[in-house]
Amino acid sequence: MTATAGSNKRAIRRALVSVYDKTGLEDLARGLHEAGVELVSTGSTAGRIAAAGVPVTKVEELTGFPECLDGRVKTLHPKVHAGILADLRLESHRQQLDELGVAPFDLVVVNLYPFRETVASGATPDECVEQIDIGGPSMVRAAAKNHPSVAVVTSPARYADVLLAVEGGGFDLAARKRLAAEAFQHTAAYDVAVASWFAAEYAPVDESGFPDFLGATYERANTLRYGENPHQPAALYTSPEGGGLAQAEQLHGKEMSYNNYTDTDAARRAAYDHAEPCVAIIKHANPCGIAIGADVAEAHRKAHDCDPVSAYGGVIAVNRPVSKEMAERVAGIFTEVIVAPDYEDGALEALTKKKNIRVLRAPAAPAAPVEVKPIDGGALLQVTDRLQAEGDDPATWTLATGEALSEAELAELAFAWRACRAVKSNAILLAKDGASVGVGMGQVNRVDSAKLAVERAGAERAQGAYAASDAFFPFPDGLEILTGAGVKAVVQPGGSVRDELVVEAAKKAGVTMYFTGTRHFFH
């Protein structure tokens, strides 16, 4: 942001500076002083400015009132706020300032106590409360309200703009409006953080685990080419907590699209459902293949082999660093996106030979504890399904019929169960050797999902496969599709009023069946 020519510029002659984050403070203070700007400051900020050899007036010298109550009261004084809030366009305001002996401020530079960071550090409630800034937001909001007369800056990233503006005669009105908008965003995000902590942790209204207030703030990171379809404008926003897919580092390739982001998000979640090296290949938010292996190259080979036709133009997520061996294989297949925590030596060189593949680095595993789903007039909030239910542990499963599986066989069935979580309901997944071999997803009845999974697997791979169903079989017909294809074992939640009929069908076919008591609908 630079000052532009125009008669609505406000020269900067006097500045109030009070910052917690002192990044770039000395250079800012020197630059303002060299430009003839008078500096007024508080506490440690004033001390840092003075230590840099820059003349500064302490705010208590201005107010005639000492800083008190362990720093809780510093700037809450009429001689400070009148100087910020005076609308210099009005003769009456200018006259009152003269009568009161108050000089106006042209620039306010303030950033706030690190409340969010203090909470994240595990600090005690009293320590968190102490980091609730009072004077800072008051000055920021006052200056932002009075943007016709005052420029307000809340980020060190703007300091270079400040110095350019000072040299150029001040910020024009359009720039002051933009700075005011940033300032209100700054205080709004701060207030949401404080209110959310009170509602969720410090003073919850009940023990439901869901706060009575739900607030969130996002900043626009990028305007996307379009949304799901060309007639839908779209943009990417990031949360102040940072990290995650929205702030992944793009190492190569074309700009990410809306659909790229939705598929990549689904792929990362699917890959991180597994503790072993895992690769998930996703198309339209559904798996083309999920596999685990001794290493990521093996996992990718098995995941791709599940459905090579659908994997063409897919999105790949890996829960380990990508090896050169895997990268060379991926480079030979048309792939929209690959995302991983990192890339080993030689992997990026192999991938970047393909001009258009988007290569992302997202070091941390998906960690959102809750999911928010907007609906008309409101939103739904639920705890994220991380396969954390008791029934996700095979040790808790109930053998409904058939011979108990060996440890190795049970591990195969457990893989199928975990992989099935990533499939849109109604979901049936067939697996062999730690890899999906047939996926039936998104059908409105379980019979069609079973048919689709068997069809995708083919007769040879379906024979002896391990099958998982995200919800119970309401009738034996869906199960009979699987047993007719020769599956070895089935895992499902159970709980249908017709469980006896379903168990009888499995028993008749000589198929082992386990009940988990846990469902994994996914919409």
UniProtKB/Swiss-Prot annotation:
GO terms for biological process: 'de novo' IMP biosynthetic process. NCBIfam families: PRK00881.1, purH. Residues 1-154 form the MGS-like domain. HAMAP family: PurH. Keywords: Hydrolase, Multifunctional enzyme, Purine biosynthesis, Transferase. One of its GO terms (cellular component) is cytosol. The keyword Heme does not apply. Belongs to the PurH family. Pathway: Purine metabolism; IMP biosynthesis via de novo pathway; 5-formamido-1-(5-phospho-D-ribosyl)imidazole-4-carboxamide from 5-amino-1-(5-phospho-D-ribosyl)imidazole-4-carboxamide (10-formyl THF route): step 1/1; Purine metabolism; IMP biosynthesis via de novo pathway; IMP from 5-formamido-1-(5-phospho-D-ribosyl)imidazole-4-carboxamide: step 1/1. InterPro entries: AICAR_Tfase_dup_dom_sf (IPR024051), Cytidine_deaminase-like (IPR016193), MGS-like_dom (IPR011607), MGS-like_dom_sf (IPR036914), PurH-like (IPR002695). Its EC number is 2.1.2.3, 3.5.4.10. It holds the Pfam family MGS. CDD domains: IMPCH. This is Bifunctional purine biosynthesis protein PurH.
